[in-house]
UniProtKB/Swiss-Prot annotation:
Domain of life: Eukaryota
Region (Disordered): 345-375
Source species of the chain: Bos taurus
InterPro entries: CELF3/4/5/6_RRM1, Nucleotide-bd_a/b_plait_sf, RBD_domain_sf, RRM_dom
Low complexity biased stretches: 359-369
Assigned keywords, A-Z: Activator, Cytoplasm, mRNA processing, mRNA splicing, Nucleus, Repeat, RNA-binding
Assigned protein family: Belongs to the CELF/BRUNOL family.
Full protein name: CUGBP Elav-like family member 3
One Pfam family hit: RRM_1
Main location group: nucleus
GO molecular function (one): mRNA binding
GO biological process terms on file: mRNA splice site recognition; positive regulation of mRNA splicing, via spliceosome; regulation of alternative mRNA splicing, via spliceosome
Alphabetical list of PANTHER family matching this protein: RNA BINDING PROTEIN
UniProt GO cellular component terms: cytoplasm; nucleus; ribonucleoprotein complex
Gene name of the encoded protein: CELF3
Amino acid sequence: MKEPDAIKLFVGQIPRHLEEKDLKPIFEQFGRIFELTVIKDKYTGLHKGCAFLTYCARDSALKAQSALHEQKTLPGMNRPIQVKPADSESRGEDRKLFVGMLGKQQTDEDVRKMFEPFGTIDECTVLRGPDGTSKGCAFVKFQTHAEAQAAINTLHSSRTLPGASSSLVVKFADTEKERGLRRMQQVATQLGMFSPIALQFGAYSAYTQALMQQQAALVAAHSAYLSPMATMAAVQMQHMAAINANGLIATPITPSSGTSTPPAIAATPVSAIPAALGVNGYSPVPTQPTGQPAPDALYPNGVHPYPAQSPAAPVDPLQQAYAGMQHYTAYPAAYSLVAPAFPQPPALVAQQPPPPPQQQQQQQQQQQQREGPDGCNIFIYHLPQEFTDSEILQMFVPFGHVISAKVFVDRATNQSKCFGFVSFDNPASAQAAIQAMNGFQIGMKRLKVQLKRPKDANRPY
């Protein structure tokens, strides 16, 4: 029969050919087993190399953890076996306390004596710096959750110890997941990922607007060629940022209101509205009196805008509905299901002659400048599969001026290889990014951030 305070253990680093009957002899020596289940994929049924283990008695679980966890390596494995309380168990059976506002002169023994009246202590450690000086805090682990809770109820804020600036702090220590979540929140705060409503006022307003414009340009650069609606979203984001920057009421751009003018714009002189409503950083394409675009104009994604028609020519209703939105009408092929009669203007790339050698050399120099000086380029490993250039750019912008940010993609599958690089313009920013982000956990991934090797060294990939 299982005891009420029995612990459910997670067992990792198990050879995939071992089943429950093979594992029982390893664990039975520590006590009677209530349940042992090998974890398998629910779709394929394949062994995942781990298991859940529950003893009838709590002491048996503690003995097994003490004797086996990272102490023994099973045949065929490169790393020692992992035996620890399962996540679901550790949340309900928290026994580890954080103790803050201790005096600098207090030792492990002093802290132990303070907490011994509440139960049996498994661990007691005062945190110290590299020079051995106490940091004024400690971790204390009891054998049971009830003992830890009793210590909190009695000692928290109950006294102020000599040398401390405020009353004693006693609380449950953060779990690994909570620490990871807090670090993500701190980085999100640095990146300006706040509520847009809360940031329409105050000191962060300008920063939010700049981020919106930056994100809009990135969205357009990386996804507009896939969908015209992505371009629409980018224009919308820049529109909102530009209007907010002038203290106006932002009116969303909607495809169904092409013939009307947003009230905020109609009530404002044209000169008061920023021109940064283009895609990929370009302003709307200028037209000549003939209605045709200037021959040397730059077009987003290398595609001609739909040319304006003369008054005598028949006006397509869809084009009329989107009058003035050249970036949206730059994708006539996307409307083939709605308006098959749309002409297909040739791409700008096909019309332009090859650039002269001098321009080609300048382009090569610009490409080389995308990498920073030695000591300013960092590699990031273990990126989440869904991360793109824009995500790592936003992640590392707080540490300094970013020259380039790139996620490596498999050309055959177009899937991320889960690593990339970021180039800063100075070594100090690179070092700050490494110190802050190396080991940072995103979901189940823990980032590895390090300096890029010199060009004459073997590349890590």
